[in-house]
Design a protein with these regions (language model features):
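Central regulatory/effector-binding core of bacterial HTH transcription factors
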Residues: 17-77
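Amphipathic alpha-helical segments that line or abut small-molecule/effector binding pockets
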Residues: 3, 26, 30-42, 96, ...
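Generic recognition of short, well-ordered alpha-helical segments
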Residues: 32-35, 63, 80, 103, ...
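Short loop or secondary-structure boundary microenvironments that flank
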Residues: 26, 168, 193-196
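Short, well-ordered beta-strand segments
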Residues: 21-23, 68, 117, 162, ...
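A late-sequence structural motif
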Residues: 181-219
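Alpha-helical linker/hinge and terminal dimerization helices associated
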Residues: 1-13
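C-terminal regulatory
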Residues: 60-62, 74-189, 216-219
Length: 219
């Protein structure tokens, strides 16, 4: 593990060429980072990126990565610099063919007659939905999934209704937003880097690019 997560940023703070290690959750890396890094490779051909995709916490203080993209601001701010770059908007979606088979729900109570895909996690979107009046009970979910990427694939496949990234869903012709009266759930997204951010040219170049690019894809 120590070898896998060796600190990537060079000690030569003024050198643009070299490696930067970026960590992100599987869902964030799958949905938002490929296009971002495609653009990055065109503008910064000398910088290599090691993308660490994990839903586990990566310790920047222990130099396991140079930059982290995540839904939580690190609680230990010593020797780290964090910036809120936007909010990830979540809304309810279902596949077009699923709605053709089962009908489109017109109210929150209609959800009880549908197959709902839940996220197997404490708190988070499910608690917010319950607070909005969504009738979440013991038998509310037909499916539970602990992976947001797979959850989205299940929605697209027609397994049922579930939460997905608003911008992604609105641009996908295979799905349709349902119950738009349910308020959009907004999850803050943070970009965090080592404290030497402003002194390391390569680190700052990647950080600034991610900040500018991802903020345009978030709310």
């Amino acid at each position: 593990a120590a070898t896998r997560f060796a600190h990537a940023a060079s000690d030569q703070n003024d050198a643009i060429a070299g490696m930067i290690r970026v960590t992100a959750s599987r869902a964030f890396a799958s949905f938002l980072l490929p296009d971002t890094f495609a653009d990055f490779s065109k503008s910064q051909p000398e910088i290599k990126v090691d993308l660490v995709v994990t839903d586990e916490t990566v310790n920047l203080l222990m130099r396991e990565a140079d930059i982290a993209v995540g839904m939580f601001r690190p609680t230990q701010q010593v020797n780290l610099i964090s910036k809120k770059i936007g909010e990830l908007e979540l809304a309810a979606f279902a596949a077009i063919d699923y709605l053709a088979r089962r009908g489109t729900p017109r109210s929150l109570t209609d959800l009880q007659g549908h197959d709902i895909i839940g996220q197997d996690a404490q708190g988070g979107p499910q608690e917010e939905l319950r607070a909005m009046g969504v009738p979440i009970g013991p038998n509310f979910f037909r499916f539970n999934c602990d992976d947001q990427t797979v959850t989205w694939q299940m929605i697209v496949a027609g397994c049922g209704i579930g939460l997905g990234h608003l911008r992604l869903g609105m641009s996908d012709p295979r799905v349709q937003r349902v119950l738009p009266e349910i308020p959009i759930i907004k999850v803050p997204v943070w970009l965090t880097a080592q404290a030497e951010l402003n002194a390391n040219v390569r680190l700052k170049t990647v950080f600034d690019f991610l900040s500018n690019s991802l903020s345009g894809k978030l709310a």
